[in-house]
């Protein structure tokens, strides 16, 4: 009977970059899980490209969700796969591509993001945490999804690396020409990447506006 979120209502327009902020436990991650279909709301609807997702048959829902680009807070790379295999993992299951084609695709993606090609044959355990987050972003844009979702992309990173990740996110969104939702608690990150900000507090949307309006509100 515990209510996690209530009266949540917002739109993400084509080309927009939205940041969702709030304290730990405010429901940000629950909202992300609902958007990507891991959790269902008890009431209401979720539409992606004007398609109602909540009661959509699983096979049709998967066709839509496969075209979302998602990064999770801890990267969620597969330890047993090389970096190039991680990057193309989503489409490798959907399309028949051989090793040469796969490596060429992974190389083209990391070049767009300005990452070095020497990491492609390494395993996740052989690169830093910051680089793992970069690889997760590269994987998210594989297949050119039009909606990207980032869960705490700068969490656990020093300010310099966090700033670099934000620049990479902007490059990724620009590369696919799509829209983005970023779940974060990092106010500096919000100002760097977002066009619009939603503050979740006490289980609902407490405020919605631009980063500039947010800074004015808190007198920074």
Identify what each model region corresponds to.
Residues 36:
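Helix-to-loop junction immediately C-terminal to a conserved catalytic motif
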Residues 100-118:
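Conserved ABC ATPase "signature" region
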Residues 123-127, 131:
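Conserved ABC ATPase signature
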Residues 144:
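Conserved catalytic motifs of ABC-family nucleotide-binding domains
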Residues 148-151:
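Catalytic Walker B motif of ABC-type/P-loop ATPase nucleotide-binding domains
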Residues 184-185:
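H-loop/switch region of ABC-family ATPase nucleotide-binding domains
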């Amino acid at each position: 009977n515990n209510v996690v979120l209530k009266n949540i209502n917002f739109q993400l327009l084509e080309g927009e970059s939205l940041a969702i902020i709030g304290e730990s436990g405010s429901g940000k991650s629950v909202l992300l899980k609902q958007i990507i279909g891991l959790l269902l709301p008890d009431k209401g609807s979720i539409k992606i490209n004007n398609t109602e997702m909540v009661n959509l048959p699983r096979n049709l829902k998967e066709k839509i969700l496969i075209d979302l680009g998602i990064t999770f807070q801890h990267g969620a790379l597969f330890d047993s796969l090389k970096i190039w295999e991680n990057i193309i993992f989503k489409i490798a299951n959907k399309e028949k591509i051989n090793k040469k084609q796969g490596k060429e695709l992974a190389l083209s993606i990391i070049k767009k993001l300005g990452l070095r090609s020497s990491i492609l044959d390494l395993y996740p355990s052989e690169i830093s945490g910051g680089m793992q987050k970069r690889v997760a972003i590269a994987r998210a844009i594989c297949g050119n999804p039009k909606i990207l979702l980032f869960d705490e992309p700068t969490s656990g990173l020093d300010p310099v690396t966090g700033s670099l990740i934000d620049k990479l996110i902007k490059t990724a969104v620009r590369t696919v020409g799509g829209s983005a939702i970023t779940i974060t608690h990092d106010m500096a990150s919000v100002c760097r990447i977002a066009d619009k900000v939603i503050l979740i507090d006490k289980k609902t949307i407490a405020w919605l506006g631009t980063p500039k309006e947010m800074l004015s509100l808190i007198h920074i």
